[in-house]
């Protein structure tokens, strides 16, 4: 087949590089680095490696703000996943990854391959994946297309996770109009590792072979990384070839084989990395660059499943289920024999060199030869202009929204029927959350908990972000996202350790959006410092806009905590009638950005709820101490829908009721003030609990009752609701909306 690729002259004169994603100034920079004009393959390499998705060129200045260190950190940002220490020589590896753009175009495969990619990131570190979580955003469930997206995304996550045998144990889903054409699909994987097995993605040692393992390379997903770095338009729907197709059974074999190599052949393994965004070029150039080495790759040896593939296509393909290994010279057969046992091919496709060049050979000719650091490290970094949006000042100055509630129980029922609040059982029942049999707390409580085999420990995990608060005030909202994640971990009996962040924003070239990114990072950083949860991994997804309409700022916080003893595991539901109910924290009239404001006004506006990080930290530490001392029967964080929703949720599982008198007016039942916890305590532990909390704003409200009735009293006012009525509304809402 004759080569139909454009010449260097055509690339320059017709500005073909622009179609590939390079700006004029970036193209000039490539020319000056090379001392010549790049050919088509080289232009492709730079365009994809310098995309935002691979280089973080627009977000690097912001990412530098994050605290990334702590005594618990074994591996910070920069590798496939971050790792924290949980004692006993064990670590937990975790990371969140977005697959937003592909999931709009091809929701089943987009979501499935998002799951596959994040699993590879975790096992490339040497960790065995033990759990998956996800954080999803969709538009309102009032159109057939919205329902289709939800059904297909959930089916894709379930199809991949269930097949590979990793439990999907938790997550969150929110519905807002801004996500109608920009759904967000963020997947998080958590793995367990012996600290001695931690791997690096590096290719070093002159002459050491580089091996390609796993599925063959096809034309799927070419320019997936560039596709994720531009705004959507209606034509974007046509870009299906940029969406990859996944095979979870192949991935299961790959996972076991790679962990085998790491466990039993670590002496001959130099480095290992997943082929993710930007495929082979990204994994290979990063591995060489990190080691200060060069690489020579022979494209003829890359396993191909389609005919006449060009070097450009092979290097940029994002075919799934592929890994790159660097091994010591003389041990290729040993590695090949191991992979053969799993029915996988392991092929030498190149070697490490000492000239720091990235050299690509095809049919005996050099088709690309560029400095490896130029690809992997030297992408230009942009300090984008930042400008406060007009809405921010308007929200700050606006009179606070005060709801009019004539019928408290009626509003209560309406809130429980909102899809963001309603039970997600219909969704998570499609996931296998018990496979591997270590899931101690299943979906539906504040955090998921997975036991650590052979110890008395467990790992608590959650994903959180209320993007409405970030729309009102990205700095406060960013801090609240971290605080809420930590609250969920603490309520479950865990000590928060670290976070991974999935930063989903609109187009960074708009100064108002870049301002959102900066402010959100400031808020996240402040909360991480106060709560001692460094950022150890993450992902940035920008350009979440379609036809000029962007999403709310949505930095998803994935957090992991350590439950030091299985006896500390705590869930949100009341356990026994007669238990005493307490509220930790103060309730104010804070409705801006709340589920109630959205319900009554059809929009959100005003000042975000206040967050005092010192108070947050103090309450979290007190509650965790109370749980560890065995004083707490149940605990639940107050989030969307405030006290009213939390109280109802606590009664549902066991079919109990509650008889409480609250220290605030009844229309504040649905206020979303921060730093609050609903706790129940056995009568015999009441005195000890009260003593521990005695100097704080902690209120004894009443007791859990055996009848299925919730009674809430304030002064002379009393409202009464049936637990079973509320529960049937809460459980029935999403199945009904998805019909």
From Swiss-Prot:
Positions contributing to substrate binding: 98-101, 120, 244, 318-320, 541
Active site: 53, 99
EC number, UniProt record: 6.3.5.3
Pathway(s) annotated for this protein in UniProt: Purine metabolism; IMP biosynthesis via de novo pathway; 5-amino-1-(5-phospho-D-ribosyl)imidazole from N(2)-formyl-N(1)-(5-phospho-D-ribosyl)glycinamide: step 1/2
Annotated residues for binding of Mg(2+) 1: 97, 539
UniProt GO cellular component terms: cytoplasm
GO molecular function, one term: magnesium ion binding
Keyword ATP-binding found: yes
Reactions catalysed according to its record: N(2)-formyl-N(1)-(5-phospho-beta-D-ribosyl)glycinamide + L-glutamine + ATP + H2O = 2-formamido-N(1)-(5-O-phospho-beta-D-ribosyl)acetamidine + L-glutamate + ADP + phosphate + H(+)
UniProt binding sites for ATP: 56, 95, 501, 538
HAMAP family, sorted: PurL_2
Subunit structure, interactors included: Monomer. Part of the FGAM synthase complex composed of 1 PurL, 1 PurQ and 2 PurS subunits.
UniProt protein name: Phosphoribosylformylglycinamidine synthase subunit PurL
Organism field: Listeria innocua serovar 6a (strain ATCC BAA-680 / CLIP 11262)
Gene name for this UniProt entry: purL
